[in-house]
């Protein structure tokens, strides 16, 4: 017995848990075409309260405006609230050097996200169906993809997008509309094979069906098999994802112990903007000495002694300086949320415990600070900085000091220096320069005791 479209959608919603129990309000992406019109009508049949959202991308001249007018009439006849928006899609694509298809996709989903917040609606239903998903699987296969790409479109996304028609075919949708005598718009651009999806739909899929007339069923079985594999894989990598989110780093040893380090690294790093070639290079560098850096458009990956650390790129911060500070002040807030504080007094007034170790404190004569106040400043380390570490002989670069102390690269770049001109007085929280250190204290002299917490 052939299942009706309404029952098929009901089953998909239930089995795929598209909506929370009792949640009946849905925003429907309504283009006016057969798929979206059928989706709107079926959801209403199933008792959902619907709100429609229509995008006019202005790609087909008068046709686009006629689509918008049709959607307005349909929503008025069905008493469905409608929200609509106009986009200059061609300009958007040109400014970002992306395809028209990608531009329309970005514009519509960004707007859907805004509408969800404005209307306090949890779900946005889009009308992708089984034929669309088969085309997506083929497209993804042709350009190269992983397990999730071979599965095609997800039934439900984390951003509230749901696809109730994903188990229904195009033929079933059109048969439903014909049976219900429901009219819809036909998009003439769907025949334009300059668009990749249309090329797959009109040329590649018919050829594949010559090889296997039951292509739709075969791809469905493949999808189901891959979904199972994807579920196992997701469970196996869950701890790595959780660790990376919580600490911004992962253990190199643990990555190397997995059966497929590159596959794992691709899964972990691709969401941060790293491409396949970069991730391949990261994977081959796991046994190399530390120090290498890799950059995506949004993040930096640091190859440290025993960990891979991923940090967001941020604009260069302006470092506040100590010149101009009033000795009567007691602290200086730094841009990253850390704080340098100080106390003024004689040795009897100050808490000097732990002054040398772990170097979270620095004692300087008040007279020295007052005389050099205009030359004192706080900044990040830079190439060529040197220090004569207290308790050690000789001089070394600040970078060598960090390496010898096994300080991770990410921590090095977050360090602060108290400097007198070009001289490093204190690697704040790590080591004072012995040239500025005080070996003998005067009971009557006043000092400034600087404190810094890592």
UniProtKB/Swiss-Prot annotation:
GO molecular function, one term: ATP binding
Database matches in InterPro entries: Lysidine-tRNA-synth_C (IPR012796), Rossmann-like_a/b/a_fold (IPR014729), TilS/TtcA_N (IPR011063), tRNA_Ile_lys_synt (IPR012094), tRNA_Ile_lys_synt_N (IPR012795)
Protein's UniProt keywords contain Transcription: no
UniProt entry tagged with the keyword Cytoplasm: yes
GO process terms (BP): tRNA modification
Record EC number: 6.3.4.19
Similarity field: Belongs to the tRNA(Ile)-lysidine synthase family.
Protein's cellular compartments: Cytoplasm
GO cellular component: cytoplasm
Superkingdom: Bacteria
Binding site for ATP: 31-36
NCBIfam families noted in UniProt: lysidine_TilS_C, lysidine_TilS_N
Record function comment: Ligates lysine onto the cytidine present at position 34 of the AUA codon-specific tRNA(Ile) that contains the anticodon CAU, in an ATP-dependent manner. Cytidine is converted to lysidine, thus changing the amino acid specificity of the tRNA from methionine to isoleucine.
Keywords: ATP-binding, Cytoplasm, Ligase, Nucleotide-binding, tRNA processing
Encoding gene, per UniProt annotation: tilS
Domain notes: The N-terminal region contains the highly conserved SGGXDS motif, predicted to be a P-loop motif involved in ATP binding.
HAMAP family assigned: tRNA_Ile_lys_synt
Swiss-Prot/TrEMBL catalytic activity: cytidine(34) in tRNA(Ile2) + L-lysine + ATP = lysidine(34) in tRNA(Ile2) + AMP + diphosphate + H(+)
Protein name, entry field: tRNA(Ile)-lysidine synthase
